Amino acid sequence: MAREGSRKLGQHYEGVAARYLESKGIRIIERNVHNRGGEIDLIGMDAEALVFFEVRFRADGALVDPISSVSAVKQQRLVRAASFYLHRHGLWDRVSRIDVIGITPGHSSKYRIQWIKNAIQAD
């Protein structure tokens, strides 16, 4: 039951992130992509670049901010999932990057959203 609640909460914040990104000109093309490489929360187009988004939410009082919560292991999984997606769809020649969206409760607005472009690099 807790897992289902966590999944719904994750989908809610992915929706918040998608609306934010669309307001900034990103065209969301896929959500919750699962493949052998792992999971990608959102995939979008930023001009000619294919962007893989990791969405993170942290409540007030969390020990770690959302951006810092992306561990080295999670970064490796994201790179693997993005690589698998590019390979599977024949998009190796496409400019791509992995961005992180951090969401926390806002003070003057409902949410505070931080967008780090090219946050994760493949080694």
Curated annotation (Swiss-Prot):
SUPFAM superfamilies: Restriction endonuclease-like. GO terms for molecular function: nucleic acid binding. Belongs to the UPF0102 family. This is UPF0102 protein Maqu_2464. It comes from Marinobacter nauticus (strain ATCC 700491 / DSM 11845 / VT8) (Marinobacter aquaeolei).
